[in-house]
């Protein structure tokens, strides 16, 4: 028979507004008629018909306790089972609180420890307002703190004293407890019993401190046998084959490093004892992917490095070719300058050679004259006269010789002696200064017969631009100057020399040294003595 929760619960004293609001929710509609899993599904048989009834689960007890007329072990609501109690998952016994109301939050406590706090009420969801005057949140006063501290100290001292006393080999006698007075009233109230009530003084019996212990409390009690192991289902035994025997064969332990007995063990036995062949080596495929990725990255890096190196070599080759071109151009320019300088040097060398030959000839002549003058003085005078002779003059036949140096005698115009006219003859004006009335030998002279180059001789070389070239060039300035001195301006005054800066201060050092040498009393006395001697 099934019961509804509404029939079991008592009538509510006051309707809760929050509960009424929840029940008005459409989710609760039509759920009151559904059977609840928390209700008891069956009831115990009525009294007098429980001969063969054995209560096993919580549902057999209903909402009551144990049945004293049934002499079997009964655990109503799991009482007495402790940790071994077993609760069904879908069945839960009804529990009532101190106020007589059914505890519906028992469903939320399934699977949790009994001491765990489970918030299953609507008030637990709301924020709790604390009052400052509430006793639950007030700090304890000083008296309460002192009392708690004293109780804690006494408890700790008791524990420590008991530990110390148990460790001592001989203990002193325990202090006896104070006597207790008990009022005793006998159960038989008759005249033979004497007084109706009596006072009994109860005193603790004194113990002998040297008495050995009566009971062995240090003996270890064996544990109870544990629960039997769970049964393991085995397959039927089979006959061992040779392959199974070889698989289960464990080789002896043979060391790869030590052989104190000196046994000769085969290499296959050592490898079998090593156990390396029993392990299956599994190589991850990511290693191959990593190796391929590294190889591709290395190849690309090498290609990039090679490309960069080729580009650098090409740039270096271009720079080298440009530098070689510049050097070749500079070398060609230097060769041209050197060839020009060599031509100038050759011309200068030719002039120098000519001058050296002239100088050498003159030295030979001087040496010859000196030798002749030393040996034959008369011949030296004759040679001296010949040296003064003008051999460069052109001798023209039919013309008078006007060179007085050649004859050594002065020549006069004989026609002057035949005329009587002079300065006072009135042949010329007073303003004119011309002692001669006509040019002497003006018709023909030696200078007219001297060769002079004609003006138009270089027309075939320079053309008609010779006059322009002469006008553009300065007659008294060289066409080409020295390198580095062409832009210098001509100074108006004498030559001025520039004084270099004294970087190391040598001039000041020399002046200071000279002043030191000149200074002193001895120097002044010597100077005065010299002046006195000069005077």
Swiss-Prot record:
One of its GO terms (cellular component) is spliceosomal complex. Residues 1-58, 211-254, 313-353, 376-416, 421-440, 508-535 are annotated as: Disordered. Residues 22-34, 376-393, 511-535 have a biased composition (Basic and acidic residues). InterPro entries: SKI-int_prot_SKIP (IPR017862), SKI-int_prot_SKIP_SNW-dom (IPR004015). Residues 179-342 are annotated as: SNW. One of its GO terms (biological process) is locomotion. PANTHER family: NUCLEAR PROTEIN SKIP-RELATED (PTHR12096). Belongs to the SNW family. This is Uncharacterized protein T27F2.1. It comes from Caenorhabditis elegans. The lineage of its organism: Eukaryota, Metazoa, Ecdysozoa, Nematoda, Chromadorea.
